[in-house]
Amino acid sequence: MNKTDTLILEGGALRGVYTSGVLDALMELGIRIPNVVGVSAGSLNALSYLSRQPGRSRDINLNYVNDPRYMGPSHLLKTFSFFNFDFVFGELSHELVPFDYETFYKSEQSMWAVATDCRTGKAIFYHDKEMGEEFFTACRASCSMPLLCSMVKVGEDVCLDGGIASCIPLPEELPFPAGKLVVVLTRQKGFRKKGQGPAIDQMYRRRDRKS
């Protein structure tokens, strides 16, 4: 396991609780994989892995899942976003379940958050070492699911959830030599996504016109 070069974390909204358990186990064993790629919810889990805070991601999802400040239809109606990322990266990370920014910034591990460029439809890999505080905006973009969230501007890019363009990045997609990979999935073996149907297509078109 110590020879692993890259860890890829699939998204999956609240299914990411499984991922947080895997990362907690790695932290408890003292295993620090050099390169970490997070897609959607995987990027939020990756943050606590680099800040070396076992249990943090789990506690957030279990303790705040029913908190309307965190997510919910009322927030969707008010802001066009089901998830309240201002709360996640604000009060939650600074006061309620503090994020260890100092350890994160000093980490020798590298992290990439995957988002989808709304102009090109291609995946963008944002690197924590190159962005400073704006990297957290990239993580927000990585988690912004279409229809349920508004588009997020990262620099000059306009982005949505990374899972649209690259739900599980292939080695050749990565902006660095991947080496030996470990991929944490949040779907069962053999899962195949079904078509979304005409009703969902119509909802997307309506949302696009509003945007």
Each PLM stretch: what is its role?
Residues 1-39, 47-210:
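Patatin-like phospholipase
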